[in-house]
Structures are given as structure tokens and as C-alpha cells.
Amino acid sequence: MSGGKGKAGSSEKASTSRSAKAGLTFPVGRVHRLLRKGNYAQRVGSGAPVYLTSVLEYLAAEILELAGNAARDNKKSRIIPRHLQLAIRNDEELNKLLGHVTIAQGGVLPNIHQNLLPKKSAKGKASQEL
């Protein structure tokens, strides 16, 4: 029996975060705290913050991947709000999810109505018919 202070005789292992246990990068503990403090429900289960964190991480990864592709298409190495806007609006499901979201400095999608485009030349059609 050791009477001194310290952890000389104990074999306690280092604590592992819930994010590491779930294989996530986003913080599970912070999401759990925000769920408790936000008055969304009286009690919060132990699996709810893990699930919500994984969903948030997946959405962030999806948007950042598409925005990175948009930045590369524009020959840029840095993602700007314009790239986020293009990524979200060109993806059908993300556009539906974030349809009412305004992105500051995002701009608009390039779109020209069909009636405003120049008409096809009549010479091209006539030569093909003969």
C-alpha cells in the first residue's frame, strides 16, 4: 500500500474522446453540450450527439468537396464564398436542403433565359433540308 501522492502504482489509461471512439473529426462533446443547453428537450440520449455530429461532418465534407472542385474549375487554390454558392446551387439535393439560405458574397448562378438567346440562323436549317 503506497501512502504517497501520484500515480506511481496505478495503471490508468489515457482517456479517449467520444469523437475518437466514433472516428469523427467534429467534437461530439461540444455538440452534446449545445444540445443540453439549447432547451431542445429535457433529456439528451448518449447516441444523439454522436449521430448529429456525424451528419454535420458528412454535410461539411460534401459541401467542401464540391466547393473545392468549383475552385479548381476556376483555377483558384482557395475556396471563396462564390465557390460555396456554385457548389450548393449546382447540386440538386444540397440546393433543396439549403434553398432558403443566403450566402454572403456568393453571387448568382449564370443563367440566360432561352428567349433572350440569339435565334438559330435560317440558312443552316435550309441547307440541311435540301
From Swiss-Prot:
Superkingdom, taxonomy of origin: Eukaryota
GO biological processes: DNA repair
Record's keyword annotation contains DNA damage: yes
Signal peptide coordinates: none
Residues marked Not ubiquitinated (site): 119
Record text on subunit structure and interactions: The nucleosome is a histone octamer containing two molecules each of H2A, H2B, H3 and H4 assembled in one H3-H4 heterotetramer and two H2A-H2B heterodimers. The octamer wraps approximately 147 bp of DNA.
Known function: Core component of nucleosome which plays a central role in DNA double strand break (DSB) repair. Nucleosomes wrap and compact DNA into chromatin, limiting DNA accessibility to the cellular machineries which require DNA as a template. Histones thereby play a central role in transcription regulation, DNA repair, DNA replication and chromosomal stability. DNA accessibility is regulated via a complex set of post-translational modifications of histones, also called histone code, and nucleosome remodeling.
Family that this chain belongs to: Belongs to the histone H2A family.
Protein name: Histone H2A.1
Organism of provenance: Debaryomyces hansenii (strain ATCC 36239 / CBS 767 / BCRC 21394 / JCM 1990 / NBRC 0083 / IGC 2968) (Yeast)
Gene that this polypeptide is encoded by: HTA1
